[in-house]
Amino acid sequence: MTVPAALPPIFVVNMARSVERRAHIAAQLAAQSLAFEIHPAVDARDLSEKTIRELLGEVALQPQPFLGRRLTLGEIACGLSHLQIYRRMQRDHLDDAVVLEDDVDLLPSFGSVLRALAAEPRFEMVLLGHHSARHGPYVGAETCLYRRIVHGEHRVARVCEFAMGAYAYFVTTGAAAQLARYAEPMRMPADWVTGYAPSSGVRQHAITPPCVVPARRFCEASEIGSRDAAAAVGNRTTRRLGGRAFLALRKLGFFPGLYSKGF
């Protein structure tokens, strides 16, 4: 009899005061019989410029060329929360993990997709929820044409355009270490770190269509700001590199991570 592969630990990024969000995501995970752990998120209300300097140095407080502005306190808090998980994975010698933010909806297929990925451990990073300048969260970012069946309608393939959203992804500890090095000094939001993962040396894949989407009930009250606000500036560069001809080549598998160069 084949023994089912162990699922990676699921870390839910959640602030202590975000009780409604915690209940929202906990109920969904319980409904799919998935164990999880709440990772105490850094609260932007607890951050001061002095604290940020002590934790991250001066760079995080400076205007960022690609953004055209400083990082917001919410973006810094979110980035720190994801960094903490990457470091914990290394400290605790985990093989891999799933990172979930608390303001998402899990599709009924989420658990089955995770089990299928766990049964075939060959990916460094897989975006479970994502969107792009071209497509919304129910379609997801563009991926290469060569796709492997994961479960039902869901396929996994290399990402070939800037994927927005760090709200749901699988990552190995080796890839998490590369992302942590790439993220410092902090100069970009968390979903730029994941979106431009190829620049850190990580082979990035995505599930299409995504099996996790932003929860509409929480979109208006995001602590970070609009999920697309930070990406809007960066996508001017993405579009220059990502014209239709270049995208077509990347979809065929020719340098699919080329969109991330320069970040």
PLM regions and their residue ranges:
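An acidic/histidine-cluster motif and surrounding catalytic segment
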Residues: 1-100, 104-263
